[in-house]
């Protein structure tokens, strides 16, 4: 995986659960995954959890990538790698950590035999859209999801 002065990207392991939970909560404040769910996810063969850590092995950011066999908006092949989420602690942004996480996700996705890596961002999150563009992602579709309450 990637190594730079002061930090490196590596695969997350069971001992990283608490650090990964804290980073996930920073990205997804409403997430309710617990330790058991995350440990089970770390053991899945069709998903990868990546951490970027400093020289003292303190987690600075993460990426979660999976293989999806269902239709993924804007893609032309199956299966497709999907960057479920990626996050770098604010104090470490602008130093290439996000790009390194995406590069590691690309490498893992290729190893799974996928021809495409997809991701998503909220329509109102211009920062996430800019980060995706900076890493080479191209926008494909913009959708609005609806629901009808039945009960």
Question: For the regions a protein language model found, what residue spans apply to each?
Answer:
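A short beta-loop-alpha structural element at the N-terminal edge
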Residues: 7-20
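Conserved acetyl-CoA-binding loop-helix of GNAT-fold acetyltransferases
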Residues: 88, 94-107, 130-134
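Conserved beta-strand in the GNAT
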Residues: 58-67, 82, 87
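A conserved beta-turn-beta hairpin within the catalytic core of GNAT-like acetyltransferases
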Residues: 70-83, 93, 141
